[in-house]
Swiss-Prot record:
Residues 1-245 form the Reverse transcriptase domain. One of its GO terms (biological process) is defense response to virus. Keywords: Antiviral defense, Magnesium, Metal-binding, Nucleotidyltransferase, RNA-binding, RNA-directed DNA polymerase, Transferase. Its EC number is 2.7.7.49. Mg(2+) binds at residues 109, 188-189. The lineage of its organism: Bacteria, Pseudomonadati, Pseudomonadota, Gammaproteobacteria, Enterobacterales. This is Retron Se72 reverse transcriptase. It comes from the Bacteria. GO terms for molecular function: metal ion binding; RNA binding; RNA-directed DNA polymerase activity. PROSITE patterns: RT_POL (PS50878). Belongs to the bacterial reverse transcriptase family. CDD domains: RT_Bac_retron_II. Reverse transcriptase (RT) component of antiviral defense system retron Se72, composed of a non-coding RNA (ncRNA), this reverse transcriptase (RT) and the following cold shock-like protein. Expression of retron Se72 confers protection against bacteriophage lambda. At multiplicity of infection (MOI) of 0.02 cultures slow growth when infected with lambda but do not collapse, at MOI 2 cultures enter growth stasis. Responsible for synthesis of msDNA (a branched molecule with RNA linked by a 2',5'-phosphodiester bond to ssDNA). SUPFAM superfamilies: DNA/RNA polymerases.
Length: 379
């Protein structure tokens, strides 16, 4: 299968859409009109350069509807095997695995992808891929976009990113396949690879084909991030979505593995004399994530490093635990169901904190966790 296929039943009316989403028609109309007020905005730092990215998180009512849209619509689509990211069993590792042991690897990045996806193209997904009626398609488009764009942080945004090129990407895939090339896309990262060395003309042709597809959607390729690597070049990193693909399976580079060992060494030294500061908690969590990545990629060193980290897990001091107890009592006295999104976030954070308390006081942690969990809705 080279083209996305919707396996659900087309929705023909707004009343049918309301029924599918499990809400009354009047409430659906109200939510559509209030979408612009239904997001929380914040910034996160991404990448090595700590670039700030705007994130828009839907509030509780809209989030519930978007999750329902995912379940009833986007999760009923068969996605082509060349798509990776935000799909079950398909992530940056499976994406890199497509391009192992290749002679030539070309990586391209779509500029400012999510905010550049137009409302018109989102509507086309519902209307022309799912075959929904025009008014249903427009209503759904309003529910999953913000200010005429696809918001980063929206529950449906990554599905939309995967489906944007539904009517043209399969043509590009087939064209490249006929040329003996492998193609994959991890959301905004496009990779093409070859079992043979490509000539300059062939590489130029491949890149032009990708440009042609994305330009149809008023998008562009970030030229500064375009890379072309060759296995015969000893200085080449041969990297796809951050992983080394020179051999049969994706791996971390030696430099990355060495850096992770160094981080764990620093963590072990610091953990020998204090494990309760915020700085130590942040360092340990960072190390833990890196070691988990090593484990997923089959690096045997991960077992040893995980054992070291398990002996120096972060803890809280008595002062912090006293503050948590007071805060938990406040939540238990003041919070009453149904909880707001903010209250749910606070309790989730508190449960995380009491997991850490459990490392030094299991009975206390168990007591407060049981009480706090009782406040949460079924999820």
């Amino acid at each position: 299968m080279n083209k996305p296929r919707f396996n659900g039943t087309p929705v023909a009316s707004l009343d049918s859409l309301s029924a599918m989403l499990g809400i009354e028609r009047k409430r659906l109309d109200w939510i559509v009109k209030s979408v612009s007020m239904s997001y929380k905005q914040f910034k996160v730092e991404t990448g090595k350069n700590k670039k700030e990215r705007q994130i828009f998180e839907p509030k509780r009512s809209l989030k519930g509807i978007q999750k329902k849209i995912n379940k009833e619509i986007f999760e009923k689509i068969d996605y082509p095997h060349y798509l990776h990211g935000a799909l079950s069993g398909r992530d940056y590792i499976s994406n890199a695995a497509v391009h192992t042991r290749k002679r030539t690897v070309i990586c391209l990045d779509i500029t400012n992808f999510y905010p550049s996806i137009s409302k018109k193209d989102v509507c086309s997904i519902f209307k022309n891929l799912m075959r929904f009626s025009p008014d249903v398609s427009l209503c759904l488009t309003e529910l999953v976009t913000l200010n005429n764009k696809v918001p980063q942080g929206g529950c449906c945004s990554s599905y939309i990113a995967n489906l944007l090129f539904f009517n043209s990407e399969y043509n590009l895939y087939n064209r490249l396949k006929s040329m003996g090339l492998s193609y994959s896309r991890l959301l905004d990262d496009i990779t093409i690879s070859s079992d043979k060395d490509l000539s300059s003309e062939e590489k130029t042709k491949v890149i032009k084909l990708v440009h042609g597809m994305v330009n149809q959607y008023r998008l562009s390729i970030n030229e500064s991030k375009t890379t072309i690597e060759h296995s015969k070049d000893s200085s080449s990193k041969l990297s796809v979505t951050g992983l080394w693909v020179k051999h049969g399976v994706p791996k971390l580079t030696k430099e990355n593995r060495r850096y992770i060992r160094y981080l764990v060494y620093i963590c072990k030294k610091q953990g020998a004399y204090e494990r309760h500061t915020k700085e130590y908690h942040d360092l340990w969590n960072r190390c833990s994530g890196k070691v988990a990545q090593m484990s997923r990629l089959g690096h045997v060193q991960a077992v040893e490093l995980r054992a070291i980290l398990s002996e120096i897990m972060p803890v809280y001091d008595d002062y912090k635990i006293s503050k948590l107890k007071l805060m938990a009592k406040h939540y238990l006295n003041k919070f009453t169901p149904p909880l707001t999104d903010d209250q749910i976030r606070k309790i989730d954070r508190m449960l995380y904190d009491f997991d850490i308390v459990g490392r030094t006081n299991k009975n206390l942690a168990k007591l407060y966790r049981r009480k706090l969990v009782a406040l949460l809705p079924d999820r």
